[in-house]
C-alpha cells in the first residue's frame, strides 16, 4: 500500500477571516425572533483535525448527476448517483484479508431503459392534448410545452433523460435481511424503492410514481372531496397542474416507529413501520407508511398528502424530537426563495408520537437564497439539561442553523447564520449524527468542519478548513458524505486546474479520508452504547488498519478491553476481542505477492539460457532455489527503497528463512490461534444458553422442536472445566420438561442418528457430513442455506412450520461478528 498522505489542519491553514453571525432567538411555537448574544465562531487550536487518505480511490464509469450525488447508509453502503446508474460501494471490514486497503464490495443499480410518463389522464386524451399544445400558435404554450422535459421525457431530438436525481437510504432493519432500503429518484421523475437481497443484484420492489399517479387518477386529481371539480386537461394550466402535483423533488425516510395491529382474535401486536416523505413540485408532500419488513406493494399501509403552502420547494428533512419519553415529529421544508419551516405530521396509530399544533417558522425572509440541503441532528443541551434538535441548512455560501428545545414556555427557537465559510456556493453538506459535527464543501476542493459548542443561551460553531489539495492534489469536489460513526468522509472528486488550465477529460472518483484517529475510534468502540460491531464498521476498520500496520495490538486497548470483559461480561466485548485477535493473526501472515510473482530481468535471462538443461536435476533445483532467494532478496530491497517495508517489530515476521526465526513465529501464531478458538468457544456457549432459554420459554412438556435441545445440553455439560451456574440451572429445568426424551436428529440420506459432538457440523455413522446452523444449531440438510457477511457462520432458511420464536432466532445476526446473514 502507498504511504498515506496526511494534512494537518489548524489556524494557519485558514484562508478567510473569522466569520461573523447574525443571530435571533424566539420562544413559543410561533418561532418569533428576538435579539440574542453575538457569537463569533472561528478556527481554534483546540480542535485540530488530522486528515489521512485511504486507498483505494474508486473510479466511476459515468459522470455524477443530481444535486446531492453522495449518500452513506447506516449499514455502511455509499450510493453515488451517476448519469447511467447508481454505484453502490459497501465498506466491509474483512477479518480474513491481510491487506491494509479498504475492502469495498461494489454493485450497481441500473437506470430504467424506458422513460417515465406521469399519468395525467387517459392515454388517448393525453396524446391529443400533447399534439394540441405542440401545434399551438401561442408561443407561451408551444415553447413552454416543447422545452419542458417533464412533459417530454423522451426528448424527441434531444437525448433521453437518463440518470438519477437523488437517492435516500432508509434506517437499518427495513428489508427482508434487516438492512437498508434505497429510494431512488431518476432524472425523468420515476421514484422507486430498491433492495439488495442477495448481495449481487438489486431488485426494484415498487414504483411509487406509478402507484401515486393511479391514486390521483382515481380521485380525479383532487386531494379532498371539498376541492373544486377537476378542470379540462385541454387547458394548459390544468395540464401543468397535474404534472406539478406528482413531480418529485426530494424524498426522505423517517426513523422506524411502532404501530399496533389488531389480530383476528382482537389481540393487538406491535408492528414496525417506516415513513417515506416525498416532496412534490407544487409543494405537496406525500407521506407513505410501510410495514416492515418491506417486501413490495403489499407492504404499503397508507399514503396521506399534506399541503405545505411553500412555493418552489427545494428540499425536506424529517424532524424527530424526544422529550420526557414523548416523541414528536414533523417535516422541515425549505424553499428556493429562502423560507424554512416545520410542518406537523399526524402519525395515526403510532405509539408514543405527538404532533405539533401548528407549523413552526424557522426562517421567513424571502431573501432569494435557495435552500440546497437540510440536516437535523438530535443533541443533548448541557446547560438546559434536556434534549434538543440542531437543524442546519446550506443556503448559498452560508450555513443557516436553528436550535430547537422544549421548555415550560413551549418550543424555543434560536436561529442564526454562519458566514465566511466558503467563497463559492456550498455544493454538498453532511452531518455526523453522533456529535452534531457538520461538514460542508464547495466546488473548489475546500471542506469545512463545523463543531457546535453550546453556550448558556444557544450555541456557536468552531470551524476548521480541510484543503483537499494538500491530500489529493488539485481537485474539484462534487459531493461529500460522512460515515455513520464519523470515522470516514467520502468525497467525489475530479481533476482540478493544472497550470491554469482545465483538464480535457473528467475522471470522477470516490475518495476516502479519515476523520478520527485510532485512539478515538478505540475509545468510542469501548464506550459504545450500540454494542454491535457491524453497525460500527467504519470504526473497527480504523482499528484493523492500525493493527495491520503495526503488527500488534496496543497495550492500552488490551488492558481496557480486559477490564470491560471482567466488569460486565457482555458478549459484545468478547466479539471485539475476537476481532482484534483475528486481525493480529492476519498481520502475522506473510504475503509474498510482491516478492515472488515479479521476476527480475536477470533471472529471466538465466532461465532462458539454462532451459535446455546441462547437468543433473539436483543442480537445476539448486540453481532455481538460489534464483528464487535472489528474487525475494531483491524484491525486499526494492520495497525498502520505496518505503513500503517498515522496521520489523517484535511481533512482525522474520525476513530470513532460518529455522531458528521460524519456530518462535510459529509458536506465536499457534498461541493466537488458541486464543481465537477459546473466544469462539465462549461465544458459542453463550449463544447456546440463549437458544436453550428460548426453548425453555416457548415449549411445553416433552415437545419436539427442530432445535437439538438434548444435544445442546450434553455439549455444554461435556466439558468438566466449564462451570456456569446459569447453564446448569437452565439445563436442569429443560431436562425436567423433556422427561427423558431425547428427540435426536436423523440424517436425511440414511436415516441414521446425527450425534451432537461438534458445534460446526454433524456426521452420521455412515460418514454423511452436514453443516450446523449457528443460530439454532440444527443440521442444515439441504443445498441452500444462508451465510453471514464475513463468512463466519451459516444459517438455515426459515421453514413455514417454524414457530415465531424460531423465526426470530433465525433473524439474529452472526454470533461472532454481528454481521447480517444472507
From Swiss-Prot:
Pfam family, one: TFIIIC_delta
Residue(s) of cross-link: Glycyl lysine isopeptide (Lys-Gly) (interchain with G-Cter in SUMO2): 225, 629
Modified residues (Phosphoserine): 19, 604, 611, 652
GO molecular function, one term: RNA polymerase III general transcription initiation factor activity
UniProt keyword Metal-binding, yes or no: no
GO cellular component, one term: mitochondrion
Record PANTHER family: GENERAL TRANSCRIPTION FACTOR 3C POLYPEPTIDE 4, GENERAL TRANSCRIPTION FACTOR 3C POLYPEPTIDE 4 FAMILY
Function noted in UniProt: Essential for RNA polymerase III to make a number of small nuclear and cytoplasmic RNAs, including 5S RNA, tRNA, and adenovirus-associated (VA) RNA of both cellular and viral origin. Has histone acetyltransferase activity (HAT) with unique specificity for free and nucleosomal H3. May cooperate with GTF3C5 in facilitating the recruitment of TFIIIB and RNA polymerase through direct interactions with BRF1, POLR3C and POLR3F. May be localized close to the A box.
Protein name: General transcription factor 3C polypeptide 4
Amino acid at each position: 500500500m502507498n504511504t498515506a498522505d496526511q494534512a494537518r489542519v489548524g489556524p494557519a491553514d485558514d484562508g478567510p477571516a473569522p466569520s461573523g453571525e447574525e443571530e435571533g432567538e424566539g420562544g413559543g411555537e410561533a418561532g418569533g425572533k428576538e435579539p440574542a448574544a453575538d457569537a463569533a465562531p472561528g478556527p481554534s487550536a483546540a480542535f485540530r483535525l488530522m486528515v489521512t487518505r485511504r486507498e483505494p480511490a474508486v473510479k466511476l464509469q459515468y459522470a455524477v448527476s443530481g444535486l446531492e450525488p453522495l449518500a452513506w447508509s447506516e449499514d455502511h453502503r455509499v450510493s453515488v448517483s451517476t448519469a447511467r446508474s447508481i454505484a453502490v460501494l459497501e465498506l466491509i471490514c474483512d477479518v480474513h484479508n491481510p491487506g491494509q486497503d479498504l475492502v469495498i464490495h461494489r454493485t450497481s443499480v441500473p437506470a430504467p431503459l424506458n422513460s417515465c410518463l406521469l399519468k395525467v389522464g387517459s392515454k388517448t386524451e393525453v396524446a391529443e392534448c400533447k399534439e394540441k399544445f405542440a401545434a399551438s400558435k401561442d408561443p407561451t404554450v408551444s415553447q413552454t410545452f416543447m422545452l419542458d422535459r417533464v412533459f417530454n421525457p423522451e426528448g424527441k431530438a434531444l437525448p433521453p433523460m437518463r440518470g438519477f436525481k437523488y437517492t435516500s437510504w432508509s434506517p437499518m432493519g427495513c428489508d427482508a435481511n434487516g438492512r437498508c432500503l434505497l429510494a431512488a429518484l431518476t432524472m425523468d421523475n420515476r421514484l422507486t424503492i430498491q433492495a439488495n437481497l442477495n448481495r449481487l443484484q438489486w431488485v426494484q420492489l415498487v414504483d411509487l410514481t406509478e402507484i401515486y399517479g393511479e391514486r390521483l387518477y382515481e380521485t380525479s386529481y383532487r386531494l379532498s372531496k371539498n376541492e373544486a371539480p377537476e378542470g379540462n386537461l385541454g387547458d394548459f394550466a390544468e395540464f401543468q397542474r397535474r404534472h406539478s402535483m406528482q413531480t418529485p423533488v426530494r424524498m426522505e425516510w423517517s426513523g422506524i416507529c411502532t404501530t399496533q395491529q389488531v389480530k383476528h382474535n382482537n389481540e393487538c401486536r406491535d408492528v414496525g413501520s417506516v415513513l417515506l416523505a416525498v416532496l412534490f413540485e407544487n409543494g405537496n408532500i406525500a407521506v407513505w407508511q410501510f410495514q416492515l419488513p418491506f417486501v413490495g406493494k403489499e407492504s404499503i399501509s397508507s399514503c396521506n398528502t399534506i399541503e405545505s403552502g411553500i412555493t418552489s420547494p427545494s428540499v425536506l428533512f424529517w424532524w424527530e424530537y424526544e422529550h420526557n419519553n414523548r416523541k414528536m415529529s414533523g417535516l422541515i421544508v425549505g424553499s428556493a426563495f429562502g423560507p424554512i419551516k416545520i410542518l406537523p405530521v399526524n402519525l395515526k396509530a403510532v405509539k408514543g408520537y405527538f404532533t405539533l399544533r401548528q407549523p413552526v417558522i424557522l426562517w421567513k425572509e424571502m431573501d432569494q437564497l435557495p435552500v440546497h440541503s437540510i440536516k437535523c441532528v438530535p443533541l443533548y443541551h448541557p446547560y438546559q439539561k434536556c434534549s434538543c434538535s440542531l437543524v442546519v441548512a446550506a443556503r448559498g455560501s452560508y450555513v443557516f442553523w436553528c436550535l430547537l428545545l422544549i421548555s415550560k414556555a413551549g418550543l424555543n427557537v434560536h436561529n442564526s447564520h454562519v458566514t465566511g465559510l466558503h467563497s463559492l456556493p456550498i455544493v454538498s453538506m453532511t452531518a455526523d449524527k453522533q456529535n452534531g459535527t457538520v461538514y460542508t464543501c464547495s466546488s473548489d476542493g475546500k471542506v469545512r468542519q463545523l463543531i457546535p459548542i453550546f453556550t448558556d443561551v444557544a450555541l456557536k460553531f468552531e470551524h476548521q478548513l480541510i484543503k483537499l489539495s494538500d491530500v489529493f492534489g488539485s481537485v474539484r469536489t462534487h459531493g461529500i458524505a460522512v460515515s455513520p460513526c464519523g470515522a470516514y468522509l467520502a468525497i467525489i472528486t475530479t481533476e482540478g486546474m493544472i497550470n491554469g488550465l482545465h483538464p480535457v477529460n473528467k475522471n470522477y472518483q470516490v475518495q476516502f479520508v479519515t476523520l478520527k484517529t485510532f485512539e478515538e475510534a478505540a475509545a468510542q468502540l469501548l464506550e459504545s452504547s450500540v454494542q454491535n460491531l457491524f453497525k460500527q464498521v467504519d470504526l473497527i476498520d480504523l482499528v484493523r488498519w492500525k493493527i495491520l500496520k503495526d503488527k500488534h495490538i496496543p497495550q492500552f486497548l488490551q488492558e481496557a478491553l480486559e477490564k470491560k470483559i471482567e466488569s460486565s461480561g457482555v458478549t459484545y466485548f468478547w466479539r471485539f476481542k475476537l476481532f482484534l485477535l483475528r486481525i493480529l493473526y492476519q498481520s502475522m501472515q506473510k504475503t509474498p505477492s510482491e516478492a515472488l510473482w515479479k521476476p527480475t530481468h536477470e533471472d529471466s535471462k538465466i532461465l532462458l539460457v539454462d532451459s535446455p538443461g546441462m547437468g543433473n536435476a539436483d543442480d537445476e533445483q539448486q540453481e532455481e532455489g538460489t534464483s528464487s532467494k535472489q528474487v525475494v532478496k531483491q524484491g525486499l530491497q526494492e520495497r525498502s527503497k520505496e518505503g513500503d517495508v517498515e522496521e520489523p517489530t517484535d511481533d512482525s515476521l522474520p525476513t530470513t528463512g532460518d529455522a531458528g526465526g521460524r519456530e518462535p513465529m510459529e509458536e506465536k501464531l499457534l498461541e493466537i490461534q488458541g486464543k481465537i478458538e477459546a473466544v469462539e468457544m465462549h461465544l458459542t456457549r453463550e449463544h447456546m444458553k440463549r437458544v436453550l432459554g428460548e426453548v425453555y420459554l416457548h415449549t411445553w412438556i416433552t415437545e419436539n422442536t427442530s432445535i437439538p435441545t438434548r444435544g445442546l445440553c450434553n455439549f455444554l455439560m461435556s466439558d468438566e472445566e466449564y462451570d456456569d451456574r446459569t447453564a446448569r440451572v437452565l439445563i436442569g429445568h429443560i431436562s425436567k420438561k423433556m422427561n427423558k426424551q431425547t428427540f435426536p436428529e436423523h440424517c436425511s440420506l440414511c436415516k441414521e442418528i446425527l450425534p451432537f459432538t461438534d458445534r460446526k457440523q454433524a456426521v452420521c455413522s455412515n460418514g454423511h457430513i452436514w453443516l450446523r446452523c449457528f443460530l439454532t444449531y440444527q443440521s442444515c440438510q439441504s443445498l441452500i442455506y444462508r451465510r453471514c457477511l464475513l463468512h463466519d457462520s451459516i444459517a438455515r432458511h426459515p421453514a413455514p412450520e417454524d414457530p415465531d420464536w424460531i423465526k426470530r432466532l433465525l433473524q439474529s445476526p452472526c454470533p461472532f461478528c454481528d454481521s447480517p446473514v444472507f
